[in-house]
Amino acid sequence: MHRRTFLATGAATALGGPALAQTDRQRTLRFVPYADLSIFDPIWTTADITRDHGYLIYDTLYGTDAELQPQPQLAEGHLWEQGGRICTVTLRDGTTFHDGEPIRARDCVASLRRWMAVAPMGQTIEALLDELTALDDRRLRFRLKRSFPL
């Protein structure tokens, strides 16, 4: 091994080690957006910065993984019934808002209705719905006008 290769390898190894002396404060992620955030509500704008902020702050029932497959986030899971016309989504237990209040199915229904009233994709989904209701604190039901292939 050449001297320069040996020194470069040693330096790279030393630099790649963990920062053992970090405090909790140093582990805080600081996010610097590329633009000023003027609208906090992702429903009322199509600005990328607002969308990015929304994904960092708000949760969704489902998200997508690295292979773009749907994965439960706020949802624990779902059950399809009546040949794909009814989907019952169960929320994860113990989820809360920032103030400690539990997230209930009726909160999700209200958020979805608000989204469906404004967003073009929401309006498309609303056109497919016969009914959207909260069955109890942890379950909400989507009743579709016809079976929907997923």
Regions found by a protein language model. Give the residues of each.
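Short, well-ordered beta-strand elements
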Residues: 26-35, 86-88
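N-terminal export signals
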Residues: 5-21
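N-terminal lobe/hinge region of extracytoplasmic solute-binding protein
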Residues: 32-82, 113, 124-125
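Surface-exposed binding/hinge segments that line
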Residues: 90, 124-150
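Solvent-exposed coil/turn segments that connect beta secondary-structure elements
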Residues: 34-37, 66, 83-84, 92-94, ...
